[in-house]
């Protein structure tokens, strides 16, 4: 919707009001190539280029549900990622209503709903959608946001679960179907024009799956271009699909209305058995050809040119049982080991071409088609001159009426969507319009507004999961009492001084280890961050600052409780406020370090391993076992980067910067505090102890900056 001044207005999705739309998403010559390691007949490993997607051209109409289907390993999710801009090396052109898709354009106009519903378990359905509205809808009134959320809850059929927690393995919450609908609601609250869904019915029962697709169908009718991948949809779900794109081995097998699949099969000379789904029958036929000597190239040529593929023999047509068909990728190497290359990684088995696909019985008479479609598994040399880049090859492919007349799957006659041939004949000039200037700001809220919204959400999550904070507090309280009773009344000798040094180093280690439980908590939250920021929901900087500010008061409480317990019980000397600040800075720098490590590792097991390994190193080089002056020159740098060095030395300086006697040596000489520091090569100057605080603060800032850099530049849902 545009106002009179040309600016784009607020687009509200009302899925209860069907509207006819034209236009949509177009794509041409989409190709995605990866380098695979393969083993030749001599057992040697070779690098080979393999196309996971190969020259796919088509469209997804606006106001319709476009379903991407195909056998297992057909490239459905890869194709969806390519359309959604999640593959950086994709070649070809993708455009929406004639406007080329750029990363910035995709983030502002689309939403991508993953298979895994990454949501905060301790927020209710209403709160989850309201926070999404806060972050997506910008500075509109809270009343309008609440009305939008209430309307969306009703439209998604979530009224009965409005005040129910999302839940997880440990907390009972909404059902799987309701959870999936909440995920959809989070991403459509701002009315995206493009909606991508990866297997939205995965893991759901038939009733829940139908409910989800029914809501998605209503969203499409409200004006969005909806593209989803789906595997073996039920007959009820098939009635809700408006447009099909069927793939096999990364090539286009069929495109058009589901109602025209039987016509497509009839033109191939195949009849759909009575009572059987035409879509499932087509997928069975695809698998039969894939297992035959002809391969799926024959069907790809038929989809492109209408050239009827040769019929299969009776023994070849019996390869695939009636649907639902199992994945034919499993165990193929056993039957065809002498004719196939052996992959090092079977995950990409679907991308390799059958070496029967170039059989002389078909390719000799259709060499022109194979030249258009083709590639072979042993293709080591590629002509890159004909490969397109999403950003640079805008005019290499042009839709014409002849192209659409030649496609043997008519869609405009039987599809319920309002389609027009001219909707898919977008000239190259259309991509050069000035429509980009009407996309609006990159983010809906200011930096400060985002930070405040994220802080409120963090506080709610902490308040409803108090065990994380309370567990740390209980540990520090119990350990404080134990330390106070164990090290009370130290003796006035060398052993008493050693005991006091042991108390300080154990305190530092205790505070370091108490932050380790942040590893799984953040790793779980990181997936939500990646989902939310992939489409400009908020800035990585605001997320970093909000997380820091949220934990500051909780860290202060932990430090204060421990400090009060041990300070008075052990009659420690020096300013109490300095003792408290050192403990607080130690917690802050350690927490920042643990959060940074958690942002780098892929899972909490490696996270724990990394944190424990660094803890051991920092402990070894902190100066307790060997002071910095006695360390080998090539290891001194470890003393400087150890986050245990500075709180340990700061606590010692606060305790021993005095001429007071702390013990008597074996020769009967007095041991003063300054003498203890001198023996440890620690400064006896009073003002120097504040440098330790500044250094700890600097390390906390450095680790937070590194944390931000990882989030900003390396935490992206994108393939190379």
UniProtKB/Swiss-Prot annotation:
Disulfide bonds: none annotated. GO terms for cellular component: plasma membrane. GO terms for molecular function: ABC-type transporter activity; ATP binding; ATP hydrolysis activity. ATP binds at residues 70-77. The keyword Transport applies. Heterodimerizes with STR; the resulting transporter is located in the peri-arbuscular membrane. Belongs to the ABC transporter superfamily. ABCG family. Stunted arbuscule (STR) subfamily. Together with STR, required for arbuscule development in arbuscular mycorrhizal (AM) symbiosis. This is ABC transporter G family member STR2. It comes from Petunia hybrida. The lineage of its organism: Eukaryota, Viridiplantae, Streptophyta, Embryophyta, Tracheophyta.
């Amino acid at each position: 919707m545009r106002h009179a001044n040309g600016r784009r207005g607020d687009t509200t999705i009302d899925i209860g009001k069907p509207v006819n739309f034209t236009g949509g998403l177009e794509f041409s010559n989409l190709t995605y190539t990866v380098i695979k390691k393969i083993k030749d007949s001599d057992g040697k490993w070779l690098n080979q280029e393999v196309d996971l997607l190969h020259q796919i051209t088509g469209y997804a109409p606006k106001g319709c549900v476009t379903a991407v289907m195909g056998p297992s390993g057909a490239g459905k999710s890869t194709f969806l990622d390519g359309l959604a801009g999640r593959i950086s090396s994709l070649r070809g052109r993708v455009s929406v209503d004639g406007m080329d898709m750029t990363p910035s354009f995709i983030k502002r106009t689309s939403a991508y709903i993953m298979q895994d519903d990454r949501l905060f378990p301790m927020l209710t359905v209403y709160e989850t959608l309201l926070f999404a509205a806060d972050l997506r809808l910008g500075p509109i009134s809270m009343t309008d946001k609440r009305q939008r959320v209430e309307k969306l809850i009703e439209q998604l059929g979530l009224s009965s679960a409005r005040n129910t927690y999302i839940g997880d393995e440990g907390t009972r919450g909404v059902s799987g179907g309701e959870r999936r609908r909440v995920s959809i609601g989070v991403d459509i609250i701002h009315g995206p024009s493009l909606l991508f869904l990866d297997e939205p019915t995965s893991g759901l029962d038939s009733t829940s799956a139908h409910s989800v697709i029914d809501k998605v169908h209503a969203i499409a009718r409200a004006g969005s271009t909806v593209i989803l991948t789906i595997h073996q949809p039920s007959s009820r779900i098939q009635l809700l699909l408006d447009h099909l794109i069927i793939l096999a081995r990364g090539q286009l097998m069929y495109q058009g209305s589901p109602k025209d699949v039987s016509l497509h099969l009839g033109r191939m000379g195949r009849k759909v058995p009575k009572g059987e789904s035409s879509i499932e029958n087509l997928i069975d036929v695809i698998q039969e050809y894939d297992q035959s000597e002809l391969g799926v190239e024959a069907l790809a040529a038929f989809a492109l040119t209408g050239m009827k593929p040769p019929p299969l023999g009776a023994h070849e047509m019996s390869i695939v049982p009636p649907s639902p068909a199992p994945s034919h990728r499993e165990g193929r190497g056993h039957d065809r080991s002498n004719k196939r290359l052996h992959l090092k990684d079977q995950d990409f088995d679907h991308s390799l071409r059958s070496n029967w696909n170039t059989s002389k019985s078909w390719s000799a008479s259709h060499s022109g088609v194979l030249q258009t479609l083709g590639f072979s598994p042993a293709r080591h040399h590629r002509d890159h001159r004909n490969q397109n880049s999403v950003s640079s090859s805008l005019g290499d492919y042009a839709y014409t009426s002849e192209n659409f007349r030649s496609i043997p799957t008519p869609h405009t006659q039987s599809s319920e969507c309002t389609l027009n041939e001219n909707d898919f004949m977008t000239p190259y000039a259309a991509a050069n319009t000035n429509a980009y200037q009407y996309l609006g700001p990159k983010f809906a809220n200011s930096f400060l507004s985002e930070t405040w919204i994220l802080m409120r959400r963090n506080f709610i999550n902490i308040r409803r999961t108090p065990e994380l904070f309370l567990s740390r507090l209980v540990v520090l309280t119990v350990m404080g009492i134990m330390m106070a009773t164990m090290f009370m009344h130290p003796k006035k000798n060398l052993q008493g001084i050693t005991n006091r040094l042991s108390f300080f180093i154990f305190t530092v280690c205790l505070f370091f280890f108490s932050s380790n439980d942040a590893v799984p908590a953040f790793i779980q939250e990181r997936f939500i961050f990646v989902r939310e920021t992939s489409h400009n929901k908020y800035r990585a900087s605001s997320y970093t600052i909000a997380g820091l500010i949220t934990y500051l008061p909780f860290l202060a409480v932990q430090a204060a409780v421990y400090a009060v317990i041990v300070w008075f019980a052990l009659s420690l000397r020096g300013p109490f406020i300095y003792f408290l600040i050192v403990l607080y800075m130690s917690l802050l720098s350690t927490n920042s370090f643990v959060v940074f490590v958690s942002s780098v590792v892929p899972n909490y097991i490696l996270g724990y391993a990394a944190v424990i390994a660094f803890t051991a190193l920092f402990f070894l080089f902190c100066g307790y076992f060997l002071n910095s002056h006695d360390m080998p020159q090539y290891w001194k740098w470890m003393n400087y980067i150890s986050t245990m060095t500075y709180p340990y030395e700061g606590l010692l300086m606060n305790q021993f910067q005095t001429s007071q006697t702390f013990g008597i040596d074996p020769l009967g000489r007095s041991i003063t505090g300054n003498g203890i520091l001198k023996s440890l090569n620690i400064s006896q100057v009073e003002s120097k102890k504040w440098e330790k605080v500044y250094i700890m603060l600097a390390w906390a800032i450095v680790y937070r900056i590194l944390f931000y850099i990882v989030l900003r530049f390396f935490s992206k849902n994108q393939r190379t």
